Amino acid sequence: MFCVAPPELETKMNITKGGLVLFSANSNSSCMELSKKIAERLGVEMGKVQVYQEPNRETRVQIQESVRGKDVFIIQTVSKDVNTTIMELLIMVYACKTSCAKSIIGVIPYFPYSKQCKMRKRGSIVSKLLASMMCKAGLTHLITMDLHQKEIQGFFNIPVDNLRASPFLLQYIQEEIPDYRNAVIVAKSPASAKRAQSFAERLRLGIAVIHGEAQDAESDLVDGRHSPPMVRSVAAIHPSLEIPMLIPKEKPPITVVGDVGGRIAIIVDDIIDDVDSFLAAAETLKERGAYKIFVMATHGLLSSDAPRLIEESAIDEVVVTNTIPHEIQKLQCPKIKTVDISMILSEAIRRIHNGESMSYLFRNIGLDD
């Protein structure tokens, strides 16, 4: 015999099952800053949680309020210690899972290890490993922004919303660069030409592509595995069969395809980390007659001596979003400017919580964007 709950009780249960909890998974103050901006836009309080490290360097997470039956959104930005950042996220996700959260959505504006999404030599595809770990920990949905390769979405067996920062960067160009009509969009390597083309078509501007030895090493898709010569044996290949080999690559001297003389050059990319290739591109553009040089990217990792090198370079301004904390780098280099993207993250959270369509956030976005 089955027991059916009265309709009025069913309604009450559905209401009590609702509720949104917003956590910051990082003890870093910069992550808290982004989390608070999102919370203010949503009109909710930050969830109560303690994230800290024990004296033995183990990460401990203590959730201090009930998450049972609630939609939990965990915001995590990548700090300097990326591995600790990942452990904080995984432990918090698992804690919410074991506390019977209805759904656990990770808000990770910059997906760590995204550069390691291809097989290199005898290495591994680390971003695939990280995706598997997140799913295993209990993540049910992921919100991220401008994945280094869109194919990373396929590493997950949960829904992934890969938001775009380009509308905010395009708005910055139109509002903060008065004579942007006299600009040309520049791809610092052929690998980033599609992104540059997307910016150029939307701003109705020309495009230039830098090609040559300053090209980003990551675009070199050589597999790189080398083995010792095969020992001659009965099982060895027949001497009359010669397998054709690829001709070794030789990068030409650096060249600019397109006219930048007397114009503003705006270099666009998704990540700015090691700045050597950007500096080489800026020097080349200056030599070709560009009178002002901007660099625009979604994720400003700005590792090592990047702020100092930018400050001493021909680059006039570097514009990045706040997907990654970079307050210290801004103090070291006044040329670095920040665009706030908390608005789109807040709207994504609101829509997912309310069960609304996400298509509004992907308007006019093509396959190449």
From Swiss-Prot:
Gene3D superfamilies: 3.40.50.2020. GO terms for molecular function: enzyme regulator activity; identical protein binding; magnesium ion binding. The keyword Translocase does not apply. Disulfide bonds: none annotated. SMART domains: Pribosyltran_N (SM01400). Ubiquitous. It comes from the Eukaryota. One of its GO terms (cellular component) is cytoplasm. Keywords: Acetylation, Nucleotide biosynthesis, Phosphoprotein. One of its GO terms (biological process) is bone development. The modification N-acetylmethionine is found at M1. NCBIfam families: ribP_PPkin (TIGR01251). Seems to play a negative regulatory role in 5-phosphoribose 1-diphosphate synthesis. Belongs to the ribose-phosphate pyrophosphokinase family. This is Phosphoribosyl pyrophosphate synthase-associated protein 2. It comes from Rattus norvegicus (Rat).
